[in-house]
């Protein structure tokens, strides 16, 4: 019998939660849970924070003129920024996997 999914244990859900707290709740205390993918989670969270301005610039160059990133849903902003970070700075992971997993994480 398969164990049920616990969305709080899925790495990209954890990444989204941490970054949402950092960007929108001004959560300065970034602690990372014990997890088998802890290094990956920390890399993506810290990398997205460090490169936030570059990621935002990149996104804004691809948005239509009537779309402003800061006017989009906050959760959507975080998901897109995480995905863009991975697509640009984690080339070992297939883009199909990155997109699929962030789409799955957005369903939780």
Question: Model features per residue range: what roles?
Answer:
Residues 1-108:
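N-terminal interaction/assembly modules
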């Amino acid at each position: 019998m398969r164990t049920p999914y616990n969305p709080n244990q899925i790495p990209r859900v954890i990444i989204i939660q941490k970054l949402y707290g950092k960007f929108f709740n001004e959560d300065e205390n970034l602690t990372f849970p014990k997890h088998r993918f802890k290094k990956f989670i920390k890399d993506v969270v810290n990398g997205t924070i460090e490169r936030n301005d570059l990621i935002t610039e990149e996104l804004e160059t691809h948005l239509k003129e009537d779309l402003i990133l800061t006017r989009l849903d906050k959760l959507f902003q975080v998901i897109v920024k995480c995905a863009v970070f991975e697509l640009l700075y984690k080339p070992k992971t297939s883009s199909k996997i990155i997109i699929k997993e962030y789409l799955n994480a957005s369903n939780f």
